[in-house]
Amino acid sequence: MKTGRIVKSISGVYQVDVNGERFNTKPRGLFRKKKFSPVVGDIVEFEVQNINEGYIHQVFERKNELKRPPVSNIDTLVIVMSAVEPNFSTQLLDRFLVIAHSYQLNARVLVTKKDKTPIEKQFEINELLKIYENIGYETEFIGNDDDRKKIVEAWPAGLIVLSGQSGVGKSTFLNHYRPELNLETNDISKSLNRGKHTTRHVELFERQNGYIADTPGFSALDFDHIDKDEIKDYFLELNRYGETCKFRNCNHIKEPNCNVKHQLEIGNIAQFRYDHYLQLFNEISNRKVRY
């Protein structure tokens, strides 16, 4: 038996990495009976049959899992936004952050296309990123001349997953980091201000102290797994200040003696962050139940 990590999955074949050696494996029939499928990122135990082939016997417990796209055991989720084409959006960023925290993922923010961004817009984005840094997020704003290898190797060890909407430059970023990957890229649609999907599956690529993965771009974000009363926990500053609200279940909207509303009034919480919280709270409160 060998133990390794699934780094690629295509048509029911799972490529497992064991210290740089790759094995094409398939899950035993037991998994089909349990209606359980391995995903990229899983740590598995498998039996070798023939050269570099085998059958998966066990999938070890996942510490976390992203549902769309399916990838597990993520150490850091890098939310990739572009400054322009498509334009930087704090609302979209906040939604990505909520998704990340709902899956217990550590998140950091990478903004691309600095070299294509007017100076005034660069200043505006830098000021917004300072707000996110004060909340507790690591952020970076990069252009075409920045050394991708230096950036990636400075990130935490383990599995790094790049996530973001289509067209923000995830595949381009990886091509600069590892030119031999030659990942497909596409220009954005001028009419829609968003990109076309070029990455169609998740694949892990080795880096100095772990792995890095590109993921298919999002055209929509799914909040079906999140309850309205959980959202406040995924806005980190609301969660922090909410600990001293009068009521433990305070949603920071109309409740009396709300510390979050007080911190908002004195400027310790950014108005746009609170507005995005309210929008998402109302959106989830009013969603229709799916049967």
From Swiss-Prot:
The alphabetized list of GO BP terms reads: ribosomal small subunit biogenesis
Its subcellular locations are: Cytoplasm
Instruction: Identify which cofactors the protein needs according to its UniProt entry.
Output: Zn(2+)
What's one Pfam family here?
Answer: RsgA_N
- Keywords attached to this entry: Cytoplasm, GTP-binding, Hydrolase, Metal-binding, Nucleotide-binding, Ribosome biogenesis, RNA-binding, rRNA-binding, Zinc
- Cofactor stoichiometry and binding? Binds 1 zinc ion per subunit.
User: In which residues is GTP bound?
Assistant: T112, K113, K114, D115, G164, Q165, S166, G167, V168, G169, K170, S171, T172
Q: Where is the CP-type G domain?
A: 63-221
Note whether Transport occurs among the keywords: no
What NCBIfam families would the database entry show?
ribosome small subunit-dependent GTPase A (TIGR00157)
Q: How does the record describe its quaternary structure?
A: Monomer. Associates with 30S ribosomal subunit, binds 16S rRNA.
Name the job this protein performs.
Answer: One of several proteins that assist in the late maturation steps of the functional core of the 30S ribosomal subunit. Helps release RbfA from mature subunits. May play a role in the assembly of ribosomal proteins into the subunit. Circularly permuted GTPase that catalyzes slow GTP hydrolysis, GTPase activity is stimulated by the 30S ribosomal subunit.
Its protein name is: Small ribosomal subunit biogenesis GTPase RsgA
Q: Which organism is it from?
A: Staphylococcus aureus (strain N315)
Recall the taxonomic lineage recorded for the source organism. Bacteria, Bacillati, Bacillota, Bacilli, Bacillales
